[in-house]
Swiss-Prot record:
Domain of life, source organism: Bacteria
GO biological process, one term: division septum assembly
Family: Belongs to the MinC family.
SUPFAM superfamilies named in the record: Cell-division inhibitor MinC, C-terminal domain
Protein name, UniProt field: Probable septum site-determining protein MinC
Length: 221
């Protein structure tokens, strides 16, 4: 039997959503560059949907925004929640107009597996546990990045960057025996080293989201 030249099948993919909250493209550029500097390799090449629900200007320059994202090596596949005039621009630019439906009320799928790393993660290395928790029996060194769609458990020192709930899971946590991180992030909310030092006096801790803010709880000895 001859294999068909193409097949159309239903599937599901995780798409990152970039929310644009104001018209000023210069300010958007500055904030975007700041976020990309924190984890430069995490978003590169990943499909991205732009949420424009807060942009109500019919003459908004969507082409300029698209050019900005492309210049930062981000892959924009479409927009969502845009007014009709902007949706028309998107069509002309070859971008999909993705209907959000009830997506905003849908909880991310909880990870059902764990990725286990039985070694130190050294400077320059990046480990990503897709659709899983991440367990590290070792130290995450300065300049290293560990990322998980679920929670991150580090049975050693955390000196680099740890990003849990990368696909939007707000129930994800980060646990480290020694919390000396350059950055911690859960579902996009992040603290840099100075924030961690200002908000915590504990050496070992559990980082989690409380509402829309991060908090650190001391681990029992």
């Amino acid at each position: 039997m001859q294999t068909p030249s193409l097949e159309l099948k239903g599937s599901s993919f995780t798409l990152s959503v970039l929310h644009i909250n104001q018209l000023d493209l210069e300010k958007v550029t500055i904030e975007l560059d700041g976020k990309l500097a924190i984890a430069p390799q995490f978003f590169l090449g990943a499909p991205l949907v732009v949420n424009l629900s807060r942009i109500k200007a019919p003459d908004y320059n969507l082409a300029a925004l698209k050019d900005l994202l492309i210049s930062r090596q981000l892959v924009i596949v479409g927009i969502t929640e845009a007014i009709d005039e902007i949706a028309t621009q998107a069509k002309a630019l070859g971008l999909a107009n993705i209907k959000s439906g009830k997506q905003s009320n849908t909880q991310p799928q909880l990870p059902k597996t764990s990725k286990i790393v039985k070694q130190n993660v050294r400077s320059g290395q990046q480990i990503y546990a897709k659709n899983a928790d991440l367990v590290i029996f070792g130290t995450v060194g300065n300049g290293a990045e560990v990322i998980a769609d679920g929670s991150i458990h580090i049975y050693g020192n955390l000196r680099g960057k740890a990003m849990a709930g990368a696909s939007g899971d707000k129930h994800a946590i980060i646990i480290a025996r020694s919390l000396e991180a350059e950055l911690v992030s859960i579902a996009g909310q992040y603290w840099l080293a100075e924030n961690i030092q200002h908000n915590s006096t504990t050496k070992s801790g559990c980082v989690r989201l409380e509402g829309e803010s991060l908090t650190i709880e001391a681990l029992p000895l």
